[in-house]
């Protein structure tokens, strides 16, 4: 990123919206809009997230936005979307972000319904690596879900590409699904993230999305980084079968399911994936599998990504 692109509080040339060519609309975020843009001097293509100060103030989330900027600007990992810089004018705050050319994981989940196990293995491994990095920096993410994971180009060997392209037995839809095992998946949103400077520290703030909330957060109890382990388990479950593990049309029952850890497996799950999820979705935070053991689990060590498309 060009050196002159610095936060408005830093040194050097002050970044303004005039430094960018604004392209197509990419989507709507929690507190603003996202556009494709190009920084004019470097020609670097970025995602420009626009937050409106009036809305931030009306929602009383000034502190949350400041925390998001502070945390996101100071993390750097292959599985985390890069926040290059941010700046502001009288009415807006602008975040200059790495582009994710293949969009949100949630959009792909809506498109395909569910994913083959090797694809899920790749997604969860990438996300778990990012969580391991964050936890080592005493950062709790607190809002892991498909909407907050973006898809970028990964490393696909020529052998894989040739094999996929030469296989006339699969449709374009199936071909794209198989390719998903070779993309790179990155955490994108740090709106609910928090830095806890004390190792092993605990918090009580309720946040996140109900379907992924661990019991201790939902019930307003103190919690620690193990909250992200539970959410990772709920995400893994949803990617495999297409439905969150504790979901019910009635919110009251969803809450009961979470509190009692009541869920069941469909035929989509392998023995390894069942064991993997069961080790994360445990009522007691202290009993949940560690992020290091997650990355060593057999389910995340699958190497055959040329799987059949789920029916």
Curated annotation (Swiss-Prot):
Pfam name, any one: Pkinase
This protein's record includes keyword Cell membrane: no
A single MF term (Gene Ontology): protein serine/threonine kinase activity
UniProt effect for mutating residue 171 to A: No effect on autophosphorylation
Subcellular localization, as worded in the UniProt entry: Nucleus; Cytoplasm, Cytoskeleton, Microtubule organizing center, Centrosome; Cytoplasm, Cytoskeleton, Spindle; Cytoplasm, Cytoskeleton, Spindle pole
Complex formation: Interacts with EB1 (via C-terminal residues 101-238).
Top-level taxonomic group: Eukaryota
Protein name listed in UniProt: Aurora kinase
Family: Belongs to the protein kinase superfamily. Ser/Thr protein kinase family. Aurora subfamily.
Organism: Giardia intestinalis (strain ATCC 50803 / WB clone C6)
UniProt keyword terms in alphabetical order: ATP-binding, Cell cycle, Cell division, Cytoplasm, Cytoskeleton, Kinase, Membrane, Mitosis, Nucleotide-binding, Nucleus, Phosphoprotein, Serine/threonine-protein kinase, Transferase
Catalytic activity: L-seryl-[protein] + ATP = O-phospho-L-seryl-[protein] + ADP + H(+); L-threonyl-[protein] + ATP = O-phospho-L-threonyl-[protein] + ADP + H(+)
